């Protein structure tokens, strides 16, 4: 009697599942070995258990070389297909950007008043509206710039005026006592000159004794009546009496 067909589904019993895994694993490794020996094939087998334990078989001396060979064979076609796809996408992107650049260049020429022959009436009206909008924005920005400059100049003017007031105040404070001191000095000089004017002039009244004089002198020069009258007149004019008349 032959073996019954096993239903392919997950074995719920943990022990039975582990026993089945061990049997099938060993059988698979044996089949891989037989295939590599009988058919001279390069076989690599990698198995991970449900707990993450690794089981492997490689017919060559290096599993890494076999895996690299597999990657070159499997992913080379994918890379080639990807390269073709990328090239096509890049070409479409180039065409899109080229059309965009041509449109911008044409718009620039239209803004400069060039190549207007191909534009319709609606296009010309739209272009006119765009130019008017641009002019409004430019004038508004220019006006704002001038107002900002004017505000800065007014602020600087206020700062300079304030500095001027401070300097003027300091100058007035420093010069406030100078006129009084000047008057005091002028008054002192005037008083000194007044006292000098009041000093009696004895040069005309006392003369040195001359050796050639034949008449004796007693230390003064004889004064006649006219000189006395002149002295009195001087007293009346100057408001004071000479010392020799006291």
From Swiss-Prot:
Keyword Glycoprotein: no
GO MF terms held by the record: DNA-binding transcription factor activity, RNA polymerase II-specific; protein dimerization activity; RNA polymerase II cis-regulatory region sequence-specific DNA binding
SMART domains: MADS
Compartment(s): Nucleus
Domain K-box: 87-177
GO cellular component term, pick one: nucleus
UniProt xrefs under InterPro entries: MADS-box/MEF2_TF (IPR050142), MEF2-like_N (IPR033896), TF_Kbox (IPR002487), TF_MADSbox (IPR002100), TF_MADSbox_sf (IPR036879)
Entry-linked Gene3D superfamilies: Transcription factor, MADS-box (3.40.1810.10)
Superkingdom as given in the UniProt entry: Eukaryota
PROSITE patterns given in the database record: K_BOX, MADS_BOX_1, MADS_BOX_2
Coarse class of the protein's main subcellular location: nucleus
Biotechnology: Combining natural and engineered alleles of J2 and EJ2 provide a wide range of inflorescence complexity that allows breeding of higher yielding hybrids.
Residue ranges occupied by any MADS-box domain in the UniProt entry: 1-61
Alphabetized UniProt keyword annotations: DNA-binding, Nucleus, Transcription, Transcription regulation
An annotated GO BP: positive regulation of transcription by RNA polymerase II
Function in brief: MADS-box transcription factor that acts redundantly with J2 to control meristem maturation and inflorescence architecture.
This protein's name: MADS-box protein EJ2
Source organism: Solanum lycopersicum
């Amino acid at each position: 009697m032959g073996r019954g067909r096993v239903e392919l589904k997950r074995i719920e019993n943990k022990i039975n599942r582990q026993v089945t895994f061990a049997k099938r694993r060993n059988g698979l490794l044996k089949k891989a070995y037989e295939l590599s020996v009988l058919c001279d094939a390069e076989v690599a087998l990698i198995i991970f258990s449900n707990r993450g334990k690794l089981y492997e078989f490689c017919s060559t001396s290096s599993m890494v070389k076999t895996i690299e060979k597999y990657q070159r064979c499997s992913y080379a076609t994918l890379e080639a297909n990807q390269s073709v796809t990328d090239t096509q996408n890049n070409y479409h992107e180039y065409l899109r950007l080229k059309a965009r650049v041509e449109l911008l260049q044409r718009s620039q020429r239209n803004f400069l008043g060039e190549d207007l022959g191909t534009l319709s009436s609606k296009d010309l009206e739209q272009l006119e509206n765009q130019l008017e909008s641009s002019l409004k924005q430019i004038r508004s920005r220019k006006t704002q710039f001038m107002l900002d400059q004017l505000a800065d100049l007014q602020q600087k003017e206020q700062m300079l005026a304030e500095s001027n007031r401070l300097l003027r105040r300091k100058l007035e404070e420093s010069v406030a006592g100078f006129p009084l001191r000047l008057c005091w000095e002028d008054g002192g000089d005037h008083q000194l000159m007044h006292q000098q004017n009041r000093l009696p002039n004895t040069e005309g009244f006392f003369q040195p004794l001359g050796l050639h004089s034949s008449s004796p002198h007693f230390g003064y020069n004889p004064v006649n009546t006219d000189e006395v009258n002149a002295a009195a007149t001087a007293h009346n004019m100057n408001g004071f009496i000479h010392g020799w008349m006291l």
